A protein has these predicted regions:
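A general structural signal for well-ordered alpha-helical segments in protein cores
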Residues: 1, 40, 94, 106, ...
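Active-site phosphate-binding/coordination module
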Residues: 1-71
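Hydrophobic packing residues within well-ordered alpha-helices of enzyme cores
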Residues: 1-5, 109, 113, 170-173, ...
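Predominant activation on well-ordered alpha-helical scaffold segments within soluble catalytic domains
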Residues: 2, 44, 144, 187, ...
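Short, structured coil segments at secondary-structure junctions
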Residues: 8-10, 18, 116-118, 172-173, ...
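Hydrophobic/aromatic beta-strand patches that form the interior of the parallel beta-sheet core
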Residues: 15, 158-160, 177, 194
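Conserved acidic, metal-coordinating active-site core of Asp-based
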Residues: 46, 50-160, 164-169, 181
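Asp-based, Mg2+/Mn2+-dependent phosphohydrolase catalytic module
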Residues: 172, 176-212
Length: 212
């Protein structure tokens, strides 16, 4: 997860898994929220029995998969990460499950999981990606934790987002920018917009902030 920071020569805390994990500047875990490995196994058994599709497990900085298909290969290319063989021995907490499948399958799985399981946050990060986390996980909680730890006022913070799991963060920070390529509901909920990801919207917004 930290290779982006390494490439940019940035040494700073990093929030991952929609706020489920925070690593400090030395890659040490300082904040962690997830569900039990028992819950992860229940979810895994259900998904495999009814849908027979690959399931990704995220545990701290490990990405583990039970099998590799085209979707997993594409995710590996996008992230620059190499998946590990699934091994839950010694694991006590899972930060996230990810299912990559056809949009119709993802829709049906999302509905069935929400009916069958409680205490979880289940959402589509895109049409073919279904993410499953503990219901306590949020980006706003992670930001609040970091601000308290670093003694930074929320009015001094800036955030950028394009999807529904960004909304709580965008509403919490001093300035929250919705990316032009964001989901319609995000654009309607957040009054301040910037250019799209492809148009370097983050840089554009920061340049304007510096000029204020």
């Amino acid at each position: 997860m930290h290779y982006f920071l390494d490439e940019l020569h940035i040494k700073a805390p990093m929030v991952s898994y929609s706020g489920g994990l925070i690593l400090d500047e030395n890659q040490k875990v300082i904040y962690s929220k997830g569900f039990s490995v028992e819950m992860a196994k229940r979810l895994y058994k259900y998904i495999k029995y009814y849908y027979q599709i690959p399931v990704s497990f995220y545990v701290e900085n490990h990405w583990m998969v039970d099998e590799i298909d085209e979707g997993i290969e594409e995710e590996s290319i996008i992230t620059g990460l190499k998946p590990e063989k699934l091994d839950l021995n010694g694991v006590k907490k899972v930060h996230k499950l990810l299912v990559i499948a056809e949009a119709g399958i993802v829709d049906r799985l999302e509905m069935s999981l929400k009916e069958k399981f409680s205490g979880l946050k289940i959402y589509k990060s895109k049409d073919t990606y279904l993410e499953i986390m503990d219901e306590s996980v949020s980006k706003s909680s992670a930001i609040q934790f970091l601000c308290d730890k670093m003694k930074i006022g929320l009015h001094q913070t800036v955030s950028f987002g394009d999807n529904y799991n960004d909304l709580d963060m965008l509403l919490l920070t001093g300035k929250g920018f919705a990316m032009a390529n964001g989901a319609q509901g995000v654009l309607e909920s957040i009054p301040t917009h910037t250019l799209s990801n492809d148009e370097d919207g983050v840089v554009y917004a920061l340049d304007n902030l510096v000029g204020e």
